[in-house]
């Protein structure tokens, strides 16, 4: 199961991982926390969506449905239902303080919604952002908190038993990037890429998804409101490099499975599970 903040985040950050496991026949589920109502609309033929958060949210809900069809058989949940939690906007914007935004949502409401999904899906592995949100986006941070705060209650039989049988998630990973990756893409002439990274030795798992790079790109192309892969900017250049389908994770809950290489990286998120 993967927990993401907005439509397109799942394809950008974990698209190859999702495609790999869907192709292998694993049950893959996605939780999307908001509809991305405040995203920047990049396609001029969709200019009517600019400044219209409700219309953009509805449009992006359609885009994610197309993207998931490209990635494979993915079970999709909107946290609390479609539109329940709203986009907070980029860090530092006035919208971060809106009462209805995800970053300001009542923790009990968010926890209840996440526990209900965890107990229904009963995942063996859950993936989300690190506690910085990857690059500090308020909704990414809130998505991390939504999952991490729900893990204990989901496993507690005394917590809202009407939400289903308790479930204790065996392994939780946070998405990340190793410092060596950033050096590699800079050496290849791709500039402007300054995410939060970690030392290579702190990485737990590396999934080489280059065999699924085409699916990841196909999913991203469905997000016409948000992404252009043909304008030659740094993001378009980056994602079309097959190395963009190598996805990196840090284990934060559960036992590390067998790995390989100088850093003993797992190559399977289910490593060590029966």
UniProtKB/Swiss-Prot annotation:
Under the heading Gene3D superfamilies, the entry gives: LmbE-like (3.40.50.10320)
- Keywords linked to the UniProt accession: Hydrolase, Metal-binding, Zinc
Classification via InterPro entries: GlcNAc_PI_deacetylase-related, LmbE-like_dom_sf, Mycothiol_biosynthesis_MshB
Q: Which residues form a coiled coil?
A: none
According to its UniProt record, which reaction does this protein catalyse? 1D-myo-inositol 2-acetamido-2-deoxy-alpha-D-glucopyranoside + H2O = 1D-myo-inositol 2-amino-2-deoxy-alpha-D-glucopyranoside + acetate
In which domain of life is the source organism classified?
Bacteria
Residues bound to Zn(2+) are: 6, 9, 140
- Which GO biological process annotations does it have? mycothiol biosynthetic process
Which Pfam families does this UniProt record tie to the protein? Answer: PIG-L
**Class in the EC hierarchy, top level:** hydrolase
Q: Which cofactor does it need?
A: Zn(2+)
Q: Which GO terms describe its molecular function?
A: N-acetylglucosaminylinositol deacetylase activity; zinc ion binding
Q: What is its EC number?
A: 3.5.1.103
Entry note: cofactor = Binds 1 zinc ion per subunit.
Matches recorded under HAMAP family: MshB
- Stated role: Catalyzes the deacetylation of 1D-myo-inositol 2-acetamido-2-deoxy-alpha-D-glucopyranoside (GlcNAc-Ins) in the mycothiol biosynthesis pathway.
Q: Per the similarity annotation, which family is this?
A: Belongs to the MshB deacetylase family.
- Name the record gives this protein: 1D-myo-inositol 2-acetamido-2-deoxy-alpha-D-glucopyranoside deacetylase 2
Please tell me the species this chain comes from.
Saccharopolyspora erythraea (strain ATCC 11635 / DSM 40517 / JCM 4748 / NBRC 13426 / NCIMB 8594 / NRRL 2338)
Question: Could you read off the lineage of the organism from its UniProt record?
Answer: Bacteria, Bacillati, Actinomycetota, Actinomycetes, Pseudonocardiales
């Amino acid at each position: 199961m993967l927990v993401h903040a907005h439509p397109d985040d799942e394809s950008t950050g974990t698209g190859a991982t999702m495609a790999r496991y869907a192709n292998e026949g694993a049950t893959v589920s996605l939780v999307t926390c908001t509809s991305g109502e405040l995203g920047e609309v990049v396609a001029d033929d969709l200019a009517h969506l600019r400044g219209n958060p409700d219309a953009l949210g509805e449009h992006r809900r359609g885009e994610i449905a197309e993207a998931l069809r490209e990635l494979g058989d993915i079970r999709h949940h909107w946290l609390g239902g479609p539109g329940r939690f709203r986009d907070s906007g980029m860090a530092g914007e006035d919208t971060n303080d809106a009462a209805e935004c995800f970053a300001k949502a009542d923790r009990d409401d968010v926890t209840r919604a996440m526990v209900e999904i965890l107990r229904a899906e009963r995942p063996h592995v859950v993936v989300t952002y690190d506690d910085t949100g990857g690059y500090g986006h308020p909704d990414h941070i809130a998505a991390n908190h939504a999952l991490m705060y729900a893990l204990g209650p989901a496993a507690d039989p005394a917590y809202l038993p009407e939400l289903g049988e308790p479930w204790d998630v065996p392994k939780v990973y946070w998405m990340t990037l190793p410092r060596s990756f950033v050096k590699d893409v800079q050496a290849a002439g791709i500039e402007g890429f300054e995410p939060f990274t970690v030392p290579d030795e702190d990485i737990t798992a590396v999934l080489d998804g280059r065999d699924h790079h085409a699916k990841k790109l196909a999913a991203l192309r469905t997000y016409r409101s948000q992404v252009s892969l043909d304008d030659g900017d740094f993001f378009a250049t980056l994602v079309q490099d097959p190395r963009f389908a190598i996805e990196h994770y840090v284990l934060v809950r559960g036992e590390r499975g067998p790995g390989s290489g100088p850093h003993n990286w797992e190559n399977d998120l289910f490593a060590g599970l029966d």
